[in-house]
Amino acid sequence: MKHRTFFSLCAKFGCLLALGACSPKIVDAGTATVPHTLSTLKTADNRPASVYLKKDKPTLIKFWASWCPLCLSELGQAEKWAQDAKFSSANLITVASPGFLHEKKDGEFQKWYAGLNYPKLPVVTDNGGTIAQNLNISVYPSWALIGKDGDVQRIVKGSINEAQALALIRNPNADLGSLKHSFYKPDTQKKDSAIMNTRTIYLAGGCFWGLEAYFQRIDGVVDAVSGYANGNTENPSYEDVSYRHTGHAETVKVTYDADKLSLDDILQYYFRVVDPTSLNKQGNDTGTQYRSGVYYTDPAEKAVIAAALKREQQKYQLPLVVENEPLKNFYDAEEYHQDYLIKNPNGYCHIDIRKADEPLPGKTKAAPQGKGFDAATYKKPSDAELKRTLTEEQYQVTQNSATEYAFSHEYDHLFKPGIYVDVVSGEPLFSSADKYDSGCGWPSFTRPIDAKSVTEHDDFSFNMRRTEVRSRAADSHLGHVFPDGPRDKGGLRYCINGASLKFIPLEQMDAAGYGALKGEVK
């Protein structure tokens, strides 16, 4: 697999195809010039970045932005790591990109950061975000591991904990998914997370690159790993599976939160992106390794899969050829296959992964069913009830003012007609008629349905003055309101955590008790 040279003055970028990978899609590779390297940049306090870059060490970079509350909450942690002897085997720096991806302009950012108190945190400023753009960084926080020779070895999008960071430095191919990841909440002491009720199913449906990326986007999916299943040999390589007739199928191991998704839900998502009538072929990929199949480890799941197949058969005249079999074996694919479309955004993908952002028919996945709120009075349940019925993320966001990852929630991309209610109490808050794509990474609205349904509070954290927004009835933390919204609609942007909301589709509003508000949607 080719690596991208980072410390050179010029690097070429494009579709990076691993040896013997899934059938390639022809794309224009193109080129991109990197006018500045890390060593030529300066830090926020005007020091040469080269001070922090020793050539005989790999470099672990954290990309962050001033508008990302999660990033801000982790600055102290990053400063601690930068001084910790455990991280001495690598250069550890952070990069901010003034003028890129909604970041403040250079002078404004410098002035803002000067008011913070992280004297030992290396913050390199890359004006215009050249480095972030060339590495396809579009989500904050994100991490990149650069080898001693300047090769990009790994890109991780999202927050990582100390154990994951150290594992990454020791081994760029480390399985970060096997390490504990705690949800971080700002300005409060971290508490232990509840044990998640997870289950696993194994899905084969053509090239695993696309299927893995697709399931990773689905709310409630904990992990998706590419591998080889139900073959005749042990520990096969990609070349074995492709050319030596081992009988394995390219398969994605999907681990999901059973309190948020059922197996039938997973199968509905699966059938959205595979042709169940195509024998040994999906997209451009042909061969028995590209067959379709659902492989289970719990015999009770066979009937659930059979029922889903029977339902799906009604949509087709041709017979379905999807296998419904017990899992005989599964072996993780090589590291270069894992997260392939994150490492190589222009790589081949035979499915439309955006379908992961579309809720299932009749489903509103942000909140478990049967939450038990009082729709008439919008009462807040007890804390014990909230811990039982909300997900860990929903609880931390609404009760402890935590912040979900930017661009992580399905509601950021949802624009179907309906209303958004408080996930805690059910109180109506926002309408789809007032929702717009602000590009900030969180669901954005120009106004609440009723101005009295939200309360505003001064928030002076992180050397900024912001206006926090909370729900009236349950006092749930929702997000913040900013004066940079569409001028023709009042000029406000309500930037709201998707985890604080529950979406009620227009066609379900009557049954859910919100029929009187349908006029706010139409």
From Swiss-Prot:
MF-aspect GO terms: L-methionine-(S)-S-oxide reductase activity; peptide-methionine (R)-S-oxide reductase activity; peptide-methionine (S)-S-oxide reductase activity
One cellular component term from this protein's GO annotations in UniProt: cytoplasm
CDD domains in UniProt: TlpA_like_family
Ranges annotated as spanning the membrane: none
Thioredoxin domain segment(s): 17-174
Region called Peptide methionine sulfoxide reductase A, residue ranges: 199-354
Enzyme Commission no: 1.8.4.11, 1.8.4.12
Function according to Swiss-Prot or TrEMBL: Has an important function as a repair enzyme for proteins that have been inactivated by oxidation. Catalyzes the reversible oxidation-reduction of methionine sulfoxide in proteins to methionine.
Protein name: Peptide methionine sulfoxide reductase MsrA/MsrB
